[in-house]
Amino acid sequence: MTIRPALLTDCERMMQLIKELAVYEKAPDQVTVTLDHFVTSGFGSNPVWWAIVAEVNGVVQGFALYYIRYSTWKGQRMYLEDILVTEAARGKGLGTLLMDELMVIAKQNKFTGIVWQVLEWNEPAINFYKKYRTKFDAEWINCSVEMN
């Protein structure tokens, strides 16, 4: 098992895993980003996301994708957009290795914390996050506006 920074050549596999996650989260039709846009956003002249991958026997079996979020109260924070391990590779410690590496990256970059969302019905993920002394906020409501 190897945890390493994502490479441009990993993007196609990462997109496969994103689609797998969308199926698990009961939203397969919600993934509308193209591979080209995904690649440009992470590896173009002005990257807006970074990622680490979990590789087993030369195959990417999971990844964590993040970007920098700014809080007027807390300063720069890591926003964890996705952390996932393919179903076939779960239970082998890859998620823990990814999360531990994110903690290292956050400390190295002097981020004031890591924030993310989890679906309220995703008990396996919630239980996983609890071992990191995660605070779960039931007060804030998610808002979004689509620009289609």
Model region roles, listed by residue range:
Residues 41-53:
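A short helix-loop-beta-strand connector motif used in the catalytic cores of GNAT acetyltransferases and
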Residues 50-62:
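Conserved beta-hairpin
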Residues 15-40:
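Conserved GNAT-fold acetyl-CoA-binding loop/helix
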Residues 2-14:
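A short beta-loop-alpha structural element at the N-terminal edge
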Residues 96, 108, 120-139:
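Conserved active-site alpha-helix within GNAT-family acetyltransferase domains
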Residues 116-125, 144-147:
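Conserved beta-strand-loop-alpha-helix junction that forms the acyl-donor binding cleft
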Residues 91-104, 131:
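Conserved acetyl-CoA-binding loop-helix of GNAT-fold acetyltransferases
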